[in-house]
Amino acid sequence: MSEPDKPSQANIDKMWAYARKYAEKSGTSLHPDVGVTETVVEGLARHIEQVGRPLCPCNFYPDPQAEAKLRRWICACDEMQKWKYCHCLLFVSPDGLPITEHLPEDHEGRAAYGLVKDPHPDKGRATARVLERQKAEGPRD
């Protein structure tokens, strides 16, 4: 990455702090290859500067501003919130594989990595837990 494209150290530091905190909260690990983690963290920091939000750097967006407004790929993305699956490999199992246990059977992540168990099923999956609770409570009047 050339120096002019490098995000500010403040945004890099902000995203490192976020990544560490979210990994702890979600019961995941940061990728054991620090180079992978650094690349993703810098990509998130770069998107903060470009679109004002930490948009997932592992996707191509024809219109990053429009994608940021949709919020589905803001870190932690919808897939992480619902299935605890990070296709960027930022939030992974201790051995560096993405957690696939909660993915639908036909999801590309399950096909690519097989079944990778969730080391801490009691943590993370915030969106999935809300949906499960609402389903258990039944319809509201």
Give short role names for the model-derived ranges.
Residues P139-R140:
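Intrinsic disorder/low-complexity segments
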Residues S2-K135:
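Long, distal/terminal scaffolding or interaction modules
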